Structures are given as C-alpha cells and as structure tokens.
Amino acid sequence: MAPRQKKPNKSDDDDGDLHRKKQSFFKQRFPGFKKKASELSVLCGNSVGFICYGPDNDLHVWPQSQDHNPQALHEIVAKFNALSDERRKNHACDLNDFPHHLKGLSREELRKHLLHLDSQLLGVREQKIEILKKTLTGSSEKDGARVSENSAISDHKLKIEPNLTDILSEDHLIRVSDKKLGSCDVFDELAYVVRGSRNLNENVSNYESKDAAYTGMDHLGTFGGNYLQEAAAELYQTYNLGNFCDDHVWDLEFASRLPPLHTFSDPLMTTNTCQTMSSDMISI
C-alpha cells in the first residue's frame, strides 16, 4: 500500500485571505467613523477627534488639516492639555463610580444631600404650580368673556320682552277677537287693499276718486261697511248661505260651497283686482 501523500499546508494562504478581508472591511467602515464623529461634533457643539489603528497597525487620526476641518487633532489635544486640572474635573465623571457615590458618606453629609434633593423637588413643584396657574387664569378669562356675552344677550332679551308683551296686550286685539268674523265692523277695522297697488298702506277708501272710470258700477257707492253689507246681502240671496239678520251679522262658514273666484261678475272679485286683506294694515 502506497503511503498517503501529505496535503499542502494552507494556513499561510488562509492568513493572507483573512488579512485582505480585514483591510477591505476597514476601508469600507472608516469613512463611516469620520461621518459619525462629525455628526457628534455638530450635535454637541464641541470639538471631536479620534485615533485608531488599522489592520497593518498603521495609525489613523481624525480630523486632519486635509479634511477641511477648522481644527486638526493635534490642535484639539493641545487645547485640552492647556486646561487646568480643576476645569477638567468639573466636566469629568467616572461612570463606574456613579452608582456608588453615596458610599462612605457620613450622616451629616447624607442629611445635606437629602436636603439638596428636597430643595430641587420643591423648585420643580413650584414651577409646575406656576404653569397650572397660568393655564387656569387663561381659561377663566375665556369663561368670563363668555359669561359676559351671555349676560348681555339676556339683558337684551329682558328689554325686548316687555315691549312685545305690551304690543300683544293691546285693547284693539282683544276687541277684534271678541267680534264675529262676519261682522261688518271687523271688516271696516281690518281695511282692504287692492292687489297691484304699490303702497300697502293705501286702502280702498283712497280709490274713491277713481270711481268715475267705473260708470257701470254706480251701485257700489262708497267702499267700506255699506258696500260689504250689500255684498253680504247679495251673497245671502243668491246662494242662500248662512244667517243674515238686521244687525248685518252673518255666518261665513260657506267656503266649501263658494264657486271659484273667476266666476264672479264683480270686477273687484276677479283674480286680477281681487280685494285682499292686508295684515300690515292691522294696528299692532
């Protein structure tokens, strides 16, 4: 049996490949280190620099003068070294000792530390109370303005309601409501206007001077109670409607039996010049 041949040792080749991988990885990540350092400098408003070694133990520093940075790394280090020890301690803190800063303190020191914490809490509480007061004051002012507006509206209503009550309690409304609808006196009080007149305050009596144009209507006479009495009597005799007596009071519950308006021969009862009651003529 032939002896087994030894395979070539590839450890040297593997080390070379690993070294090349590290170099390529460092080249890819180093620009990201510089970007993060510049962002930290901008956010904190302080000068930032770092020193690192590459895969070949070569030194890399940032920032450098060729990086268009206002301060190079050696300038930052010189500025830091120029600070006194007291100034450095003011801005230095050992994070490892921070949880144990109460250890080794005497009773008096602990009492002072607690008083300091209480004073800090009291200051925070006072600030919170001031903020709440300002908030409540602003809301109360808005509520006061709303209440004053509502009170003004209520006062205005109180001023209007007595006048409205006086108007609704006029004697002539009661007098008109007590009379029957068919009374001639009621028609005289309500007054009528001729449709088509420009002024609603003009009643039929204003058109008495124009009767000369109606030569065939001499039997109408003067518009008013007499005309309405004659019209009521004529309706009573023609259609036998309601009850008509000597005091000229008649019942108007015949609306369903009346013919349409356009069938009347009376020119004042046609659709063009029909007499219409005007609510504006009622003295309210």
Curated annotation (Swiss-Prot):
BP terms from Gene Ontology: positive regulation of transcription by RNA polymerase II
UniProt region (Disordered), positions on chain: 1-20
Keyword vocabulary terms for this entry: DNA-binding, Nucleus, Transcription, Transcription regulation
Gene3D superfamilies assigned: Transcription factor, MADS-box
GO cellular component, one term: nucleus
Molecular function per GO: cis-regulatory region sequence-specific DNA binding; DNA-binding transcription factor activity; DNA-binding transcription factor activity, RNA polymerase II-specific; protein dimerization activity
Domain of life: Eukaryota
Oligomeric form and interacting partners: Interacts with MEE14/CBP1.
Function (record text): Probable transcription factor that may function in the maintenance of the proper function of the central cell in pollen tube attraction.
Name listed for the protein in its UniProt record: Agamous-like MADS-box protein AGL49
Organism: Arabidopsis thaliana
